[in-house]
């Protein structure tokens, strides 16, 4: 069995509270195997149970809605896909300050024409690169000043689900996914 990583969008901010301990219990009771979490920002690992990422992601979204009463969008990646995200890093010189280097994970890849339009814009001093279902961005003045928020990217790119993790978290997710 392979490992899958569920990246929950916008949890544990404001009234959208999803205690990771409770989520782990719920997932175990629902038949998810080898469930573990990292941080309170919605990072969950589990054995795929012979099911696709889409199937497990859908099951998890249903479980979250039933238990917590609000929609939580989930972006799924396999441990092999996360390996690819790390290996393909298009801005390797920017990882020295990993808190300012972010990977935004999309539920599906944005359309090429929309990506080209965004590439034509000037976001200096920020730098960014698209690869597949991810956008890598470096914000030298800090991520809090960056325009590359999941909300901005979802709106501009027409991609409904996007969630971001800094490079330190991406590396830790891969380590923990085994």
Model-derived features: positions:
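Surface-exposed, charge/polar-rich loops and edge strands
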Residues: 2-178
């Amino acid at each position: 069995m392979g490992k899958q990583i569920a990246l929950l969008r916008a949890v544990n901010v404001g009234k959208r509270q999803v205690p990771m301990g409770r989520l782990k219990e719920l997932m175990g009771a629902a038949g998810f195997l080898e469930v573990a979490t990292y941080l309170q920002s919605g990072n969950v690992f589990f054995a795929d149970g012979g099911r696709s990422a889409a199937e497990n992601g859908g099951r998890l979204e249903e479980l979250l809605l039933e238990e917590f009463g609000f929609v939580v969008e989930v972006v799924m990646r396999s441990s092999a896909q996360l390996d690819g995200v790390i290996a393909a890093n298009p801005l390797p010189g920017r990882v020295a300050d990993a808190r300012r280097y972010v990977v935004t994970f999309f539920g599906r890849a944005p359309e090429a024409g929309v990506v080209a339009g965004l590439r034509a814009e000037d976001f200096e001093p920020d730098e960014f690169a698209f690869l597949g279902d991810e956008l890598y961005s470096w914000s030298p003045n800090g991520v809090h000043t960056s325009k590359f928020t999941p909300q901005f990217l979802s709106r501009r790119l027409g991609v409904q689900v996007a969630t971001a993790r800094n490079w330190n978290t991406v590396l830790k997710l891969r380590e923990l996914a085994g």
